[in-house]
């Protein structure tokens, strides 16, 4: 019996690794170093994406998984299903154009994971944000829009989650298209307004920003927020 359990566990691990590798390969092929997505070319690889989505549809994170493994799984699922949604409606100029029965892209129930069907909002807010005190989730999940933190051209894994999200947070905060930072004035992404509480659980917002900002921000800096660019993050 123990041998059977070990064989099944090994088989699951190998399948999980190979399917994540499929998604990783797709992102590496169709997403450039700045997070721009070639959706036109990605469209031709829908069959490969579907193999990964089929894996997600029958896989549930285990309760004994380490936190980073669980976060990587759900962030990958969010991003894969967001890409699927864009491809299903391609060509389009913005994810805001997607509507189904009066619901926007984030409230359409279509993302199948472990024999359940979720909305993107449920994955982000009810699973990732609710279960984990991790503000870097906001640079992991990607909303397919210009002002979103850039989409990484890789899949997340248990081993790379911390380093990759740290790198993405540094790029996001120091990207002048998404955040304009000086010592005494900061014009921030709306993400820091919408989800301010996620970034201030262990100090002020400026404390958080200074962990990643190349420019030291004064505690008395004036804060404003930039208009959000909802144009598609690619072509």
Language model features: what each stretch is:
Residues 20-235:
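Interaction/scaffold regions that mediate signaling and macromolecular assembly across diverse proteins
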């Amino acid at each position: 019996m123990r041998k059977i359990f070990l064989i099944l566990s090994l088989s699951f691990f190998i399948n999980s690794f190979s399917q994540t590798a499929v998604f990783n390969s797709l992102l590496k092929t169709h997403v450039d170093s700045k997070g721009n997505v070639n959706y036109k070319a990605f469209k031709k690889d829908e069959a490969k994406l579907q193999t990964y989505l089929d894996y997600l549809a029958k896989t549930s994170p285990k309760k004994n998984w380490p936190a980073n493994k669980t976060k990587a799984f759900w962030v990958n699922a969010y991003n894969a299903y967001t890409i699927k949604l864009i491809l299903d409606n391609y060509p389009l100029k913005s994810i805001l154009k997607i509507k189904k029965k009066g619901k926007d892209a984030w409230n359409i129930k279509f993302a199948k994971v472990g024999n359940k069907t979720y909305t993107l909002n449920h994955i982000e807010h009810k699973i990732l944000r609710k279960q984990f005190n991790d503000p870097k989730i906001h640079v992991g999940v990607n909303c397919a829009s210009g002002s979103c933190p850039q989409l990484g051209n890789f899949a997340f894994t248990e081993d790379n989650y911390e380093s990759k999200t740290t790198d993405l947070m540094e790029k996001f905060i120091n990207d002048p298209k998404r955040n304009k930072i000086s010592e005494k004035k900061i014009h921030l992404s709306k993400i820091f307004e919408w989800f301010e509480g996620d970034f201030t659980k262990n100090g002020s917002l400026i404390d958080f920003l200074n962990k990643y900002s190349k420019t030291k921000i004064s505690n008395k800096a004036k804060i404003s927020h930039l208009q959000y660019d909802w144009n598609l993050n690619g072509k």
